[in-house]
Amino acid sequence: MTEWNHILKRKDYAPEEPSRLVVNLIPALEKKGAKRILDLGCGAGRNTLYLAEKGFEVHGIDVSETALKTTKKRLEKRKLKAELVKGDMKALPYSNSCFDAIICINAIYHQRRMQIEKTVSEIFRTLRKGGVFLANFHSKRSSRYGKGIKVEEDTFMDEFGPEKGILHHYVDKEELRKLFKDFEKVNLKIEEEKVDNYLRSRIIAVVEK
């Protein structure tokens, strides 16, 4: 994961403020009495820190040592605690049904389709009954769709810029419904923002086991 170690040294890839998606999920998690949460692909820890501040038992996992070192330093600076592990989201080192919630912000789509399917299988395995999973996905409607080297259907690799060599997989609601077919509840929402002629489109998934 040399690419991610390099990318996550950039300040613009290591923000400290939490994702709005995670902030907005908190009331639902509190209502459910959620306690143990996994930040999947935690990066530099912006959501790990926020969840720890909110009093949750937080676990963070990432493939990048650089990311985990940054997260650890930020936790220590704020005198917060979280269990951090270097690992692969396709083979989570956790027992069955051990998390009340799992979040995955700006991470799950950096894989091939079959790898995403394996990741979702691992998420389902490690979530407790009634547990919640939150993630965002690239939408096929995005202006970025089709840019870079095509590695498979709907998956492209950046050729230039800070994410050179990084995969981006794009989906639509139909694909996500198939992906989450084993979950009891599936809520999908499209969020779009257009600047000049560029459309930023993503799908927010909140699903319950």
Task: Give, region by region, the residue ranges found by the protein language model.
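Class I SAM-dependent methyltransferase core
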Residues: 39
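A short glycine-rich, Lys/Arg-flanked "PGG" loop and its adjoining helix->strand segment in the class I
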Residues: 117-129
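Class I (Rossmann-like) S-adenosyl-L-methionine-dependent methyltransferase catalytic domain
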Residues: 1-34, 43-91, 115-118, 132-208
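A short acidic, Gly/Pro-enriched loop at the edge of an enzyme's catalytic core
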Residues: 90-102
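Flexible loop residues that form catalytic
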Residues: 97, 107, 191
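A short SAM/SAH-binding and catalytic strip from SAM-dependent methyltransferases
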Residues: 101-115
